Regions:
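Alpha-helical protein-protein interaction modules
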Residues: 1-160
């Protein structure tokens, strides 16, 4: 995440203003997980899910916490919940692609990034900035998706 102190400071402000804000909870879970405070991240996200049970971001975040905690079966259950829900409700592709990126499934990550582009999701334009996707930026498949979308040069300033 870079400057952890600054990230925590800003995240605490966001959560103080809106304790159930899904992106603030997601970022807080990343901070806690990076600090190996898995139980705290789990508790935070379970409360977030109880407060907003329809929130797919908290489900994804909890699955990633479980994965990084070594609780693979629980992580896979969270992923299955998201995939099941995606059959009868709209779950943004960035949520699923970030989950796959965090658990190291490169093929599925690329598949869902392509799906985001096909769906013309706005989050496609900013996904490359997420810390879990940084390792994909030099991937041939990743570069091809953004070049085919006609936005590679604008997003990456020809740094490749």
């Amino acid at each position: 995440l870079g400057n952890m102190h600054l990230a925590e400071k800003h995240n605490n402000i966001a959560l103080s203003l809106s304790p159930s804000f899904q992106w603030a909870l997601h970022l807080r879970s990343i901070i806690l997980t990076d600090q190996h405070k898995f139980k705290a991240a789990e508790d935070l996200l379970i409360q977030g899910i109880m407060d907003d049970p329809d929130n797919p971001v908290s489900l994804m975040s909890l699955g990633v916490v479980y994965w990084k905690w070594g609780r693979k079966e629980q992580a896979q259950n969270q992923l299955l919940k998201l995939l099941h829900r995606s059959h009868f409700e709209y779950i943004k592709g960035d949520i699923i692609s970030r989950f796959y990126a965090a658990i190291g499934d490169n093929e599925k990550t690329i598949q869902w990034i392509k799906e985001m582009n096909n769906r013309k999701e706005m989050s496609f334009l900013i996904l490359h900035n997420h810390p879990w996707l940084k390792s994909f930026q030099k991937s041939e498949d990743f570069i091809k998706i953004y070049k085919n979308a006609g936005i590679f040069e604008e997003l990456f300033n020809s740094n490749f």
